[in-house]
Amino acid sequence: MDILKSEILRKRQLVEDRNLLVENKKYFKRSELAKKEEEAYFERCGYKVQPKEDDQKPLTSSNPVLELELAEEKLPMTLSRQEVIRRLRERGEPMRLFGETDYDAFQRLRKIEILTPEVNKGLRNDLKAALDKIDQQYLNEIVGGQEPGEEDTQNDLKVHEENTTIEELEALGESLGKGDDHKDMDIITKFLKFLLGVWAKELNSREDYVKRSVQGKLNSATQKQTESYLRPLFRKLRKRNLPADIKESITDIIKFMLQREYVKANDAYLQMAIGNAPWPIGVTMVGIHARTGREKIFSKHVAHVLNDETQRKYIQGLKRLMTICQKHFPTDPSKCVEYNAL
């Protein structure tokens, strides 16, 4: 008992020496005792203990951009310049501001991603976007109203006026595939835009109640979607940078369409879209030995519909125009694909 009493007395004396208990306070925190012991240890070792003042602490900001600038001011550039440009363009931001370096653009991208994360989630549904655009046009017409006697053109689609006829295009088609690539591209562009105009005029000639129906909206949205799908193809044709294999296949398709040989045009389309290569995506070597069918793996036999999403879209748009061409410019049933199915 004497040993226990002496230990209690020693502990009590230690607390009094440390000044842990002030007036009207019956307890203390163990962290305070540890802090006092640490200070006493430093004093015995000859170190000077500088008290930390709360006023010297930097104020924390609720703005994540300011916190990023303070904490990661010299963050290394972890993305390539091409990736930074791609991400900025996806978010509708300029790829470079005036006087901005590559590192500054990278830092700007990080701030944008922190403030507005995930602008576009997943792949966009093009058909739904076209339908929403048609619905928005109807809403604008309802809100804006219409004057009596005014012609209703709110529901009409844009028509490409090519100022040409099918007879003139058929005459031009005789010179397709003769070696003049620039002339072939001009004829292809003119004919595809002519078909888009024919399709739009057909849809615009419908009654108003048909345009407003579910099926009518779907048909209008399909035409708008096809037009947007073909824009990359028109751009390549205008800039003369369409790949040679794609250009050759499309030339054959257009030539057969102008001759109203729709079965042959469909065969040429399948040859371009699907191909007949044993490795349609373009595998060139498996293992250490060349395969027996390797000589067939070149651009003419590759399935172009598998190359990328842009090619898949304008190939699909081309097939829709083939159907429209057969519908408006019929021929013998033996030369048609799915005769009377339209």
Curated annotation (Swiss-Prot):
One GO BP annotation of this record: negative regulation of protein metabolic process
Domain of life: Eukaryota
Any single Gene Ontology cellular-component annotation: U4/U6 x U5 tri-snRNP complex
N-acetylmethionine modification, residue list: M1
Residues passing through the membrane, by range: none
Keyword annotations of the record: Acetylation, mRNA processing, mRNA splicing, Nucleus, Spliceosome
UniProt xrefs under InterPro entries: Prp18, PRP4-like, PRP4-like_sf, PRPF18
Any one Pfam family match given in the protein's UniProt record, by short name: Prp18
SUPFAM superfamilies: Functional domain of the splicing factor Prp18, PRP4-like
Localisation per UniProt entry: Nucleus speckle
Distribution of this protein across tissues and organs: Detected in brain, heart, liver and skeletal muscle.
Gene3D superfamilies hit by this protein: Functional domain of the splicing factor Prp18, Pre-mRNA processing factor 4 domain
Chief location category: nucleus
Subunit structure: Heterodimer with PPIH. Interacts with PRPF4 and with the spliceosome. Part of a complex containing U4/U6 snRNPs. Also detected in the cytoplasm.
Family: Belongs to the PRP18 family.
Function summary: Participates in the second step of pre-mRNA splicing. Down-regulates the expression of potassium channel subunits.
Official protein name in the record: Pre-mRNA-splicing factor 18
Source organism of the structure: Rattus norvegicus
Gene that encodes it: Prpf18
